[in-house]
Curated annotation (Swiss-Prot):
UniProt region (Interaction with beta-actin), positions on chain: 1-83
Designated name of the protein: F-box only protein 25
A biological process term (GO) from this entry: protein ubiquitination
Annotated metabolic or biological route of this protein: Protein modification; protein ubiquitination
GO terms of molecular function: actin binding
Known tissue expression: Expressed in all tissues tested, except striated muscle (at protein level). Expressed predominantly in the cerebral cortex, the hippocampus and the Purkinje cell layer of the brain. Intestine and kidney show also significant levels.
UniProt comment concerning the protein's domains: The F-box is necessary for the interaction with SKP1.
F-box domain: residues covered: 225-273
Length: 357
């Protein structure tokens, strides 16, 4: 039977809860220190010069050893999850016991720093949204805490730089719906932690939603070159780069020129052709009074029935040779002869599917 003591006869360690977490306390430490201070004797009284030099050397060596051990423990604590990859295994083998869970992968892949990278931001937000919809209760307690810490950083980032508020509003809407169902249906599903924790999380999410609702984007005073100063063909080229219809609509509200360009039928036709198949067009064909196809209305109509293609600047990758999930920039210790041929981009949906057993 495992025992948390230095000696098998001892009653175990005592712990005290502080603001920084649980810390081990020694009930006899204060009495020993007070007694030690009372009976401290100057060692020079009982030692001669030669013995005193040996005593000082031993004390110095012991101090250096303690400092080295402390530094080693501190370094190990900081670099425990330094590697930004994880081995994905779904069954026990002779070499590996157990299996990798979604919560473990979520903790190991360093999503906290990934949100600071503009290429990975949308990918991480989409992944958090999928977890909020269906996988929140499958996370461990540590993974859930990490999840909400990352979400807090995302909300603060949006409030500070005023970028991607619509994306985060959608995430918080799905999360608040899930938390509301879990809180109202307490007892119907297994929740990790006390119900009060989940109520507190729901209140926090509602507070974040209110902050984003009150977000006011201040107009920047810029005396340099602005978007409206660019030629029409460059503005049109920028609009054709967008893959989200709502981004086109939002940009069209900036100036009358951009509004005129955003209403171009060819722009919306290409957007529909990019996201949807021709068979889907025929099922939801929308014509104007003059008999022309309303591509803009068709895009938003088709969006309700079919999923749109998603683009990400950077995604997680899976190595088929090593069965390792990793960020491509960080890499992983691959043993394949041609590593690049073994890499497969992992979409947020595929990431969730990897951990369904």
């Amino acid at each position: 039977m495992p025992f948390l003591g230095q000696d098998w006869r001892s009653p175990g360690w005592s712990w005290i809860k502080t603001e920084d977490g649980w810390k081990r306390c020694d009930p006899c430490s204060h009495e020993l220190r007070s007694e030690d201070s009372q009976y401290t004797i100057n060692h020079s009284i009982i030692l001669n010069s030669g013995e005193e030099e040996i005593f000082n050397n031993e004390c110095e060596y012991a101090a250096k050893k303690r400092k080295k051990e402390h530094f080693g423990n501190d370094t190990a604590a900081h670099s425990f999850y330094r590697e930004k990859w994880i081995y994905v295994h779904k069954e026990s083998t002779k070499e590996r016991h157990g299996y990798c869970t979604l919560g473990e992968a979520f903790n190991r892949l360093d999503f906290s720093s990934a949100i600071q990278d503009i290429r990975r931001f949308t990918y991480v937000v989409k992944l958090l949204q999928l977890i909020a919809k269906s996988q929140l209760t499958s996370l461990s307690g540590v993974a859930q805490k990490n999840y909400f810490n990352i979400l807090d950083k995302i909300v603060q980032k949006v409030l500070d730089d005023h970028q991607n508020p619509r994306l985060i509003k959608g995430l918080l809407q799905d999360l608040s719906s899930t938390l509301g169902i879990l809180v109202r249906g307490v007892g119907k599903s297994v929740l990790v932690g006390n119900i009060n924790i989940w109520i507190c999380r729901l209140e926090t999410v509602l507070s974040w939603q209110q902050q984003l609702q009150n977000l006011q984007v201040t107009k920047q005073v810029n005396t340099g070159l602005t978007l409206s100063d660019l030629p029409l063909h460059m503005l049109n080229n920028i609009l054709y780069r967008f893959s989200d219809g709502w981004d086109i609509v939002t940009l069209g509200q900036v100036t009358p020129t951009l509004y005129m360009l955003s209403e171009d039928r060819r722009l919306w036709k290409r957007l529909c052709q990019y996201h949807f198949a021709e068979q889907q067009f025929c099922r939801h064909l929308i014509l104007s009074e003059k008999g022309h196809i309303e591509w803009k209305l068709m895009y938003f109509t088709l969006q309700k029935y079919y999923p749109t293609k998603e683009q990400y600047g950077d995604t997680l990758h899976f190595c088929r040779h090593c069965s390792i999930l990793f960020w491509k920039d960080s890499g992983h210790p691959c043993t394949a002869a041609d590593p690049d041929s073994c890499f497969t981009p992992v979409s947020p949906e595929h990431f969730i599917d990897l951990f369904k057993f």
